[in-house]
Design a protein with these regions (language model features):
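Hydrophobic/aromatic beta-strand patches that form the interior of the parallel beta-sheet core
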Residues: 22, 37-38, 64-66, 89-91, ...
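Active-site and donor-binding regions of nucleotide-sugar-utilizing enzymes
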Residues: 1-101
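Conserved catalytic-core segment of nucleotide-activated headgroup transferases in glycan assembly
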Residues: 89, 94-164, 259-265
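Catalytic binding pocket for nucleotide-activated donors in carbohydrate/polymer assembly enzymes
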Residues: 59, 84-85, 165, 197-259
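C-terminal amphipathic helix plus adjacent low-complexity
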Residues: 238-306
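A donor-sugar binding/catalytic signature common to diverse glycosyltransferases
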Residues: 26-40, 178-221
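Short acidic-hydrophobic, aromatic-tinged amphipathic segments that line or gate anion-handling sites
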Residues: 4-10, 173-178, 221-236
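Donor nucleotide-activated moiety binding/catalytic core segment of transferases
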Residues: 8-14, 156-203
Length: 306
């Protein structure tokens, strides 16, 4: 936006002297001024099926973790008691605010059912190469509209070009690309996906999801293992079975119970509270000398002391 200030260097950040620095990742330059606030990239769904979800890894960078709901808060509160050098505030996820607006919660009135196909960028989990042929068949066999929207990190030109070509050849297909488009999510009646974190975000709109070989299938999904099962699964999802939709609502509430569009405001309130009283009684953060050296090397910032 024209009224925003963009800081392009470490020195500009330091001169700006922020009260707080927010990041969706799991690291932050320790030499930036202000309270270090973790907002998270997504929810703890552990899509890669790792032994321990990196969502909960504590590296000693942050003063404040703004958690989303019970799925993250309960674990972080345990870590807060164990570590003692940060505070946890359950605020809800700022990005969730867009999904619970009155405009987004009203379903689009589609003449024909609309399927949003989205896929993760993770090579071992992406369904894009495996489902292209079946999706093309369904474009002919079913009276459905399709929207193709991929994760921004999915950059394989062969995959993207194939779906671009499909969209140009079939009038009932639209290619959005490897970008996030909330409008496309609002237009869709159902999502077809694999193990992308966007599944949960789509469910915030109270819509069903069909997955292909999901890494953590549950009763809130219709998961299939073979391409030929996709069509019947989508047909079932479009009927919005009561049991499925109950599971969807329970699952989303566990991750994100804050539906008042004030998650972003609560984050700012959390920073104010931390500055006023939340910092009292905290231990010092770990020295992290090696990590700090690596951080300075990454940003080419060498003033001392570290």
């Amino acid at each position: 936006r024209s009224d925003e200030i963009r800081l392009g260097t470490v020195h500009e950040v330091i001169d700006f002297n922020p009260v707080a620095v927010f990041t969706p990742g799991n690291y932050i330059p320790h030499f930036f001024p202000g309270v270090k606030v973790a907002l998270f990239h997504g929810y703890p769904i552990n899509k890669r099926n790792d032994h321990r979800d990196d969502h909960f890894t504590i590296r000693g960078w942050f003063d404040l973790y703004c958690t989303q709901g019970p799925s993250s808060t309960l674990v972080f509160e345990q870590l807060e008691r164990k570590c003692g050098f940060f505070r946890v505030y359950e605020t809800g996820w700022p990005k969730a605010d867009i999904y619970f607006s009155s405009e987004m919660q009203v379903n689009a009135r589609n003449v024909r059912p609309t399927v949003l196909y989205s896929s993760t960028f993770t090579r071992s989990l992406t369904s894009a190469p495996l489902l292209a042929e079946e999706i093309e068949r369904l474009l002919v066999a079913r009276d459905w509209n399709w929207i193709f929207m991929f994760h921004p990190k999915l950059t394989d030109p062969d995959i993207l070009d194939r779906y671009k070509r499909i969209a140009t050849e079939y009038p009932n297909a639209t290619y959005v690309g490897n970008t996030f488009d909330v409008t496309a999510m609002h237009k869709a009646d159902v999502m077809l996906c694999d193990s992308s974190s966007i599944i949960l975000e789509f469910m915030f709109l109270d819509k069903p999801v069909v997955t292909f070989r999901n890494s953590h299938p549950g009763p809130y999904l219709i998961d299939v293992r073979r391409p030929e099962e996709v069509g019947p699964a989508l047909e079932r999802a479009l009927t919005r079975p009561d049991e499925l939709m109950r599971e969807v609502r329970t699952y989303t509430m566990f991750h994100e119970p804050h539906r008042d569009c004030r998650c972003s405001a609560r984050v700012l309130d959390a920073v104010d509270d931390f500055l006023e009283r939340g910092h009292v009684g905290l231990k010092r953060k770990p020295l992290n000398l090696i990590r700090k050296w690596k951080m300075r090397r990454k940003f080419h910032y060498w003033p001392f002391p570290p």
